[in-house]
Amino acid sequence: MPVITLPDGSKREFAHPVSTLDVAADIGPGLAKACIAGRVNGELKDACDLIETDAELSIITAKDEEGIEILRHSCAHLLGHAIKQLWPQTKMAIGPVIDNGFYYDIDLEHKLTQEDIEALEKRMLELAKTNYDVVKRVVSWQEARDTFAARGEEYKIAILDENISKDATPALYHHEEYTDMCRGPHVPNMRFCHHFKLMSIAGAYWRGNSENKMLQRIYGTAWADKKALSTHLARLEEAAKRDHRKIGKQLDLYHMQEEAPGMVFWHNDGWSIFLELERFIRRKLNQYTYQEVKGPLMMDRVLWERSGHWDKYSEAMFTTSSENREYAVKPMNCPGHVQIFNQGLKSYRDLPLRMAEFGCCHRNEPSGSLHGLMRVRGFTQDDAHIFCTEDQVQAEVSSCIQMVYDTYSTFGFENIVVKLSTRPEKRIGDDAMWDRAEEALKQALRAKNIEFTILPGEGAFYGPKIEFTLHDCLDRAWQCGTVQLDYALPSRLGATYVAEDNSRQTPVMIHRAILGSLERFLGILIEEYAGRFPTWLAPMQVVVMNITDKQADYVEEVVKFFKEQGIRASFDLRNEKIGFKIREHTLRRVPYLLVVGDQEMENKEVAVRTRDGVDLGKMRIEDFAAKIHQQISLRSLKLLEE
């Protein structure tokens, strides 16, 4: 007689084993209709799975995040169902859930076209609208293998042979005549899977190994209702308009080419923004009392072996050799910073020592993963390492957190998700050390009233970590900032200081990044602002235009004055209509468009309008410069208003 405890603490007693669906029906028909799955004693289960003993139960619906993931997973099976109807010879590989959707890798000789995808989506909807039940069967390993062998599903057989123990009991999910294998759970009925769209096709190697066969990967998205799907598709459409690769080309910010994959060719305007970002962070470093250093681009392999990077990271490192010595181009700055710390005797009085670098790093990312500025091989890291005593950890972490929030708010990012990764199973140090380290990070976050979630076991083997993920205007998540404690690297590389009792001690090292990669952060900003940078970041802040040749000399004087004031300004003296000039510079997203006619020239004024089309009227050039200076010094995100 199982007793089921619900989230509100209420209990329901049953005379026989029950499923989550039975419990939902016992509560009410509405909940039974909405029930997708259950969380039984913390574990997700299919709605049909029987509960035979006392248990805590949460009923999962499409309102829950887990419910959305489950229906997406079931849409992947629905995709398989439709594929096998349209192309019966298809061999199915894997079909997992991903952010906002799902995909399925398939082996099909016929190369799918956009017309095929549309036909596939249509068939999926036809199948889903029959609202058929999804039937789960738990079978022996051998029966599962025999089932897929009879269907010629070689990839499913490979999964069984290579990944699933022979004494396991795999679950088979039957979608009418189509059968798939999965850990589950899945929706009990296809009425939950009416709101989806197939998005794109790509190539993908089986098992992610380039030595294996290239499969076709079909991506899709799925949501609980029509409104959520429409909202997501509208967001994707807006994201496409904001694509930093497209805007970067339109605004002539940078380019990339095949001869240097994953490496950025910065053009004048893009480099101007990059340098402004760097100047901004440099001012923060001064405010928070950091030393700025510069380490070598590459170092002998021996040093990377001592640091431990060679064992764990060598495949991602670029190497070269000279005079019988092997060198590695640095993928990160930390070992170099320890070398700088080790120069000269350090005392406890020297700590904390905060060392920062705009380090030019390189990582040999797979070519297929490269994506504009967001995923590159050569990048600049706004990296810092703080050497401190264990007693100083909490205060230093607190300072890092403040710096992160100060920085992100300047760019308009207020929605920051914070996660704390704690001790993994394999780790250095004793439990007491980890207790102190994790507690120091927790206290630093709590002291600033920052909500955070704990990721148990997700920390590095050498220390716990805080991750800062910002959400942009399209609610996309970008993990940028990190604060990582390291109890291993200083010891491996021989870093010590003289303690107050004259003993030699190893400092704690705090790895700190705020923007992460400057290239990636600039890509994020391009998309966040859609290329409409705030005045302080804009590569060209002001453009001054004449109406006739008569005003040309005055326009040049105005621009010279602005440049002397430190304002990035240019002129447009072309023999074009003023409306044409305004449109062109509006498309270039220049914040302020200044027009000069006879009257403005006579009164030593300019007619000011913004790229948004707001007419600010006439101003004396000194007054306009003062207003712009104030905007720049405050790093305002808004333009001047009427």
From Swiss-Prot:
**EC number assigned by the record:** 6.1.1.3
Which Cys residues form disulphide pairs?
none
| Keywords from the named record | Aminoacyl-tRNA synthetase, ATP-binding, Cytoplasm, Ligase, Metal-binding, Nucleotide-binding, Protein biosynthesis, RNA-binding, tRNA-binding, Zinc
Q: Where is this region: Catalytic?
A: 243-534
GO aspect biological process, one term: threonyl-tRNA aminoacylation
Q: Which gene underlies this protein?
A: thrS
Q: Where in the cell is it found?
A: Cytoplasm
- What chemistry does it catalyse, as a reaction equation? tRNA(Thr) + L-threonine + ATP = L-threonyl-tRNA(Thr) + AMP + diphosphate + H(+)
SUPFAM superfamilies to which the protein is assigned, alphabetical: Class II aaRS ABD-related, Class II aaRS and biotin synthetases, TGS-like, ThrRS/AlaRS common domain
The family line of this record is: Belongs to the class-II aminoacyl-tRNA synthetase family.
Leader peptide range in chain numbering: none
Q: What does this protein do?
A: Catalyzes the attachment of threonine to tRNA(Thr) in a two-step reaction: L-threonine is first activated by ATP to form Thr-AMP and then transferred to the acceptor end of tRNA(Thr). Also edits incorrectly charged L-seryl-tRNA(Thr).
Q: Which residues form the TGS domain?
A: 1-61
- Residues recorded as binding Zn(2+), renumbered to this chain, are 334, 385, 511
Q: Which Gene3D superfamilies match?
A: 3.10.20.30, 3.30.54.20, Anticodon-binding domain (3.40.50.800), Bira Bifunctional Protein, Domain 2 (3.30.930.10), Threonyl-trna Synthetase, Chain A, domain 2 (3.30.980.10)
User: What protein am I looking at?
Assistant: Threonine--tRNA ligase
What species does this protein belong to?
Shewanella sp. (strain MR-7)
Its subunit composition reads:
Homodimer.
Cell membrane is among the record's keywords: no
Is Zinc one of the keywords UniProt gives this record?
yes
